[in-house]
UniProtKB/Swiss-Prot annotation:
The species this protein was found in: Haemophilus ducreyi (strain 35000HP / ATCC 700724)
Entry's family note: Belongs to the acetokinase family.
Amino-acid biosynthesis listed as a keyword: no
Active-site feature positions: D148 (proton donor/acceptor)
GO molecular function terms noted in the UniProt entry: acetate kinase activity; ATP binding; magnesium ion binding
Role: Catalyzes the formation of acetyl phosphate from acetate and ATP. Can also catalyze the reverse reaction.
Binding site for substrate: R89
E.C. numbers: 2.7.2.1
Main location per the UniProt record: cytoplasm
Name of the protein in question: Acetate kinase
Gene (name only): ackA
Length: 400
């Protein structure tokens, strides 16, 4: 049997997403999620050949145990033998990695060197890499790292530098790196294809909206600015993350309120955003469903969309020429007609007019243009980060 399928591993701090794809046609053979690592209720669920399955993992199980379960209990011998390479999603590659690379000892060292910028994710990615080497030794030279930061490495200095002492950047790498790059890359290319614009000519603003969220300005096919910064805390209002705040708030929380550094970090990353504004949940669907009847839900939705519209408007200025489309993607971007409507209503100055029927239709797997005839284009495109990872992995290994 030919080895032409790609195993994709996305190791989070307490979870593991996995999939097996055909990199040519995107056909998904297997997908799944193991979660609640290190807890008593660690579990795994998957979909294989159209059939769903789930199981409890041993209490305290983590990445190693989950991968062992996948190989021993889910993968058939035939499917194992068809895996030709392994692609790893890596959240942070720093300045060193500007594109996907075959994993070597030097690459592992490079991922380790930027752990401080992704302290929850990069260590988990390294575990996934080592476990892949152990479980599939015959594929050791066919493991590929695909970096979420790579697409943003085309940002110019004026976009990625903070107005801090330059030595913080020069000596410590303190700058804006962005995130969700694989998603922004995919939907920008897909927008170019659908609009019949060359990839190196397309100008789009891409909005990846999920529990985390970011916006990117893409000019001539390259990212020239993005809303996330040194870490994924900067930028938009998110599920539990504050996004942009006055940095002096941190000093106020510490000096006046007596909060520790750990408490402040926990507040900004896990207790803010939609959760902080609603005081109920980080789920955007709650704010959407209760928008008309609950003041907190309305408040959360308005702040969320206002911040998003501000970024989109500023990126119109940054692109500075013809804008082909605003693209919404991610769980919220693809499914929340309300978020899209409120956001685009802030942009009426630029001629944007939502078509209600189109906007409502573009949900739950449906895509397309959501603005009215004669309006500048805004559209929904479903992201497919796994396909990008599979294609990059195949390009660097199987088809090289």
């Amino acid at each position: 049997m030919s080895q032409n399928l790609i195993l994709i591993l996305n190791c989070g701090s307490s979870s593991l997403k996995f999939a097996i794809l055909d990199p040519i046609n995107g056909d998904e053979k297997l997908s799944g999620l193991a979660e609640s690592f290190y807890l008593d209720d660690a579990r795994i669920k998957w979909k294989f050949n159209g059939e769903k399955g789930n199981a409890d993992l041993d209490a305290g199980a983590a990445h190693t145990e989950a991968l062992n379960f996948i190989v021993s209990n889910i993968l058939t011998d035939e499917l194992k033998q068809s895996i030709g390479a392994i692609g790893h999603r890596i959240v942070h590659g720093g300045e060193k990695f500007t594109s996907s690379v075959v994993i070597t000892d030097e690459v592992v060292k490079g991922i380790e060197e930027v752990i401080q910028f992704a302290p929850l994710h990069n260590p988990a990615h390294l575990i996934g890499i080592q476990e892949a080497f152990r479980i599939f030794p015959e594929l050791k030279d066919r493991n590929v790292a695909v970096f979420d930061t790579a697409f943003h490495t085309t940002m110019p200095e004026q976009a990625y530098l903070y107005a801090l002492p330059y030595s913080l950047y020069k000596d410590h790498g303190v700058r804006r790196y962005g995130a969700h790059g694989t998603s922004h890359y995919f939907v920008s290319r897909e927008a170019a294809r659908r609009l019949n614009v060359a990839e190196d000519k397309v100008n789009v603003i891409t909005c990846h909206l999920g529990n985390g969220g970011s916006v990117s300005a893409i000019r001539h096919g390259e990212c020239i600015d993005t809303s996330m910064g040194l870490t994924p805390l900067e930028g938009l209002v998110m599920g539990t993350r504050s996004g942009d705040i006055d940095p002096a708030i941190i000093f106020y929380m510490h000096d006046t309120l007596g909060m520790s550094v750990e408490e402040i970090n926990n507040t900004l990353t896990k207790k803010s955003g939609l959760l902080g504004l609603t005081e109920v949940t980080s789920d955007c669907r709650y704010a959407e469903d209760n928008y008309e009847t609950d003041d907190a839900a309305r408040r959360a939705m308005e702040v969320y969309c206002y911040r998003l519209a501000k970024y989109i408007g500023s990126y119109m200025a940054v692109i500075g020429e013809r804008l082909d489309a605003i693209v919404f993607t991610g769980g919220i971007g693809e499914n929340s007609a309300h978020v899209r409507e409120i956001t685009l209503n802030h942009l009426k100055l630029f001629g944007y007019q939502v078509d209600d029927a189109r906007n409502l239709a573009a949900r739950f797997g449906n895509e397309g243009v959501i603005t009215a005839e004669g309006s500048p284009l805004a559209m929904v495109i479903a992201t497919n980060e796994e396909l990008v990872i599979a294609q990059d992995t195949a390009r660097l290994t199987i088809t090289k």
